[in-house]
Amino acid sequence: MGLWNGKGTGGFILYLLVAFSVAVFSVSYVGDTTNPIHHHLSSLSATEKIWPDLKFSWKLVLATVIAFLGSACGTVGGVGGGGIFVPMLTLILGFDTKSAAAISKCMIMGASASSVWYNVRVRHPTKEVPILDYDLALLFQPMLLLGITVGVSLSVVFPYWLITVLIIILFVGTSSRSFFKGIEMWKEETLLKNEMAQQRANMVNSRGELLIDTEYEPLYPREEKSELEIIRSNLKWKGLLILVTVWLTFLLIQIVKNEIKVCSTIYWILFIVQFPVALAVFGFEASKLYTANKKRLNSGNTECICEATIEWTPLSLIFCGLCGLIGGIVGGLLGSGGGFVLGPLLLEIGVIPQVASATATFVMMFSSSLSVVEFYLLKRFPIPYAMYLISVSILAGFWGQSFIRKLVAILRRASIIVFVLSGVICASALTMGVIGIEKSIKMIHNHEFMGFLGFCSSQ
């Protein structure tokens, strides 16, 4: 039940801390050997918008196929797919990096929105509760939104090679962790299926067979419900209202901040205001979970407070808040929705794959749409291309959820979702890694500045 109940989690966190620390501290050495003036001149040309025309070609066909598969697999795993979209948009279609990140957010928004619409029409696989965990959404969403704003700011300060290294470190770690989690689940499912087969053989035509089948049935409804009844049961208006309010608050701050001179006093005030807003909502939900968990322990109740199976102690709550913040920062640096951290984290705290996928895409819908509105106001992406790729992502997100649910129902192995999640993160690590290394090598050959940049001077 505890978050630190195994060596795996502690070892994974230690790996991230050591690797991140080495990478960040190495900037001071690398930065001393390069020329900041040369970098400033080259960065000016790198910021030029490159928007290819939307016309039929083999590149568009290939990009459409990759976008469809990336969106389908990304929503199934609850990670979005930004690590696949950005390289596809830059290498195949020829967009500049900033425009690619903006269009990537549009695609994630479309895929996650269609995925959420599909999921609200699906019942929870084992309980009579919403498949979207609103408690976890309220816990992670404000920190994720805060992290995205911080990540966007850090993307201006951090050198490109450092962002590449940090992303590879994180993606390799989360992908490996998720893969081993999937193997564990696969073994457990195999044991359960073998036990069921053995008990069926011993209890043919008996009442016990029905009881066993009912106990294992995580994928079929216990009683018939209409689609409207399922939608109503999956929508909690109070939780939705809070989530939308937080989203609107951050959106308003971003809109006002974009109209103000960078690094002015008002700019920094608005930037700092985001912290108490996010921490207030996070603190409200954290105290709610902590109090409920304490009452549960005092009463001797063994039922979990929400979908997570961990004990909601101050340490675990702080850990989840930091992970949400890190997920947002990664989303801001990479141009993804933050699901590369949130998806694996939900599995780590004991959320079953179906609910983890649904909840992660639900939270990503808010984070990605916030960025899309901001990018639209900044005119960061061409509308025709964005609308086309959003349409592809919407179809892919819906199809991906439908296909994987049927596959899981047939095979009775929810671990498939975990393997898809791991595969998408691994593919993202490879594509982002190759592109990042190639670009970093070019920067070294051109003797460009490889250290930290000034935030105000780089705007």
From Swiss-Prot:
Name of the protein in its database record: Sulfite exporter TauE/SafE family protein 4
Lineage: Eukaryota, Viridiplantae, Streptophyta, Embryophyta, Tracheophyta
UniProt KW Ubl conjugation keyword: no
InterPro entries given in the database record: TM_pro_TauE-like (IPR002781)
Keyword list, A-Z: Membrane, Transmembrane, Transmembrane helix, Transport
GO cellular component: membrane
Annotated family: Belongs to the 4-toluene sulfonate uptake permease (TSUP) (TC 2.A.102) family.
Its membrane topology: Multi-pass membrane protein
Disulfide bridge partners, by residue number: none
Transmembrane parts of this sequence: 10-30, 50-70, 75-95, 99-120, 131-151, 152-172, 240-260, 266-286, 315-335, 338-358, 381-401, 416-436
Keyword Signal recorded: no
Subcellular location: Membrane
